[in-house]
Structure formats: C-alpha cells, structure tokens
Amino acid sequence: KSCCRNTWARNCYNVCRLPGTISREICAKKCDCKIISGTTCPSDYPK
C-alpha cells in the first residue's frame, strides 16, 4: 500500500505509476510517499 503526504503527492504518485514501468519504490521516493506493508497509513502520510 502506498501512503502520501497530501493530494499533490498522491496525484504525482498515480501519474508516475501510470505507464506501469516505474517501480512503486521509485515513484514513492520521487513523490514524497511511502510504501507500507500494513493497511493503515501513518498520520503524517494520510493520503
């Protein structure tokens, strides 16, 4: 699951992932998001 700081970061992550060629980790790093193993995002990454 990916968690982002705000809507801008979430949109950035979604667009980054669209082609299906860029890994979740790279998109998360680039867009200020985190990949988590659980189901609940931390409060500082609510999106």
From Swiss-Prot:
Record-linked Gene3D superfamilies: Thionin-like
GO cellular component: extracellular region
Cellular location(s): Secreted
Cysteines joined through disulfide linkages: 3-41, 4-33, 12-31, 16-27
GO terms of biological process kind: defense response
Keyword set, alphabetical order: Disulfide bond, Plant defense, Secreted, Toxin
GO MF terms, alphabetically ordered: toxin activity
InterPro entries tied to this protein: Thionin (IPR001010), Thionin-like_sf (IPR036391)
UniProt family annotation: Belongs to the plant thionin (TC 1.C.44) family. 4 C-C subfamily.
Record's function text: Thionins are small plant proteins which are toxic to animal cells. They seem to exert their toxic effect at the level of the cell membrane. Their precise function is not known.
Protein name (database record): Thionin
Organism: Pyrularia pubera (Buffalo nut)
